[in-house]
Amino acid sequence: MDLATILILFSSSSQWRRSKAIKNILIGRRTVSNLYWALQYGLLEDFGSLHGALPDNIDQAVTKLKQTELVKADSELQILLTEKGSDYQSKLLASLPELTLFAWSARYDVFRFSKRLNLAIQIVSEYSYSNNHYYPQTIGLLDSQLIKKWFIQNKADHLPVYLYSMLNHFLEKLSRDEFAEIFTQNLSGHHLSGQTDAQIGQTQGKSPTVISLTKLLLYTQLLTELLSKPNSKLQPLTQGLARPVISNSAAETFTMFCHYPGLTIAKIAQKRHIKLTTAYEHLLEAAIVLPQSDIPFQRLLNPKLEQKLSAIQPNDLGEWSFRVASEQVDKLDFFNFRLFQIKQLKQTD
């Protein structure tokens, strides 16, 4: 995908955003810093939605956007949409399915689902023509075995008719005919090879990146429908795709903190054989990604310290640095500073 296009979609005309953070958020690079900026930018639900899909050319992408006057950029590659950039963003949004679907592609491996489904469609299509001599699409071994098992279990039960009916019903419900065309042009079957994003883009008069995003969002929409139908014959294709909201290690640290109130964070770190700084990072991760009602802020954040920080906090929390805050509050540590910011952002969310 073209990173410059992606940056336009997830930038703002009212908030300077770190271009590197936007990219790291979308590919799901799980650090407390990236999670915090996702919360700050309102992109937490999109975290990891484009995992493995973006190139590593931030400098070139920002330069391109700046030269075309779509963004303003500073020396740290923070970007702000110009009026021209906002207009272009609006046009991009109008050309795509609903972007709220990204929240689902963040929670599930939609790219993996699309590969499974494409192989399943190819196999069933060839089966319907009694053709055993073809080259199946290459996907991961475990996924290939899953599809093979699924096909063997269901092929005798009018599978071609069922699959055709399901896909036809899905395509008929799409808001635009062009979305249905993009989806089907990507599929392979009997005497039919799926087109590349570039080929589909030429036919549709759209960029390959817009085609890629459209496909991702359409596969996401289909996946959400299948997840709501546990009795569907295609339900096995959705297995093992869910992504955890919180990392396993952070969840373990947070669980110990909640279940054993007598243990200090230092003691928890000792029992878990991790560094104290790592334990703090785990608790910050939990505070960011879990619902506010699940976080015992009253135990984590000293009330008197919270009052001091509340008295001096600026209107824009994103522009408030630890260095500035620590000059105003004696013995302030970064953990409490960041925790305070997280709580404030969640309260105003």
Locate each region found by the language model.
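A short, conserved structural fragment
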Residues: 63-76, 224-225, 288, 292-293, ...
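Short, amphipathic alpha-helical "recognition" segments used to contact nucleic acids or chromatin
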Residues: 3-14, 180-194, 247-262, 305-316
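Short, amphipathic alpha-helical interface elements at domain boundaries
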Residues: 1-54, 142-158
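Exposed, interaction-prone assembly regions rather than primary DNA-binding/catalytic cores
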Residues: 97-173
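Short alpha-helical "recognition helix" segments of helix-turn-helix
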Residues: 22, 199-202, 268-270, 321-327
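Short amphipathic alpha-helical interaction segments
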Residues: 51-67, 207-216, 277-282, 332-335
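Accessory beta->alpha helical hairpin/"wing" motif in late/C-terminal subdomains of nucleic-acid enzymes
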Residues: 72-112
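Short Lys/Arg-enriched helix C-cap and helix-to-coil transition segments
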Residues: 222-239, 290-306, 349
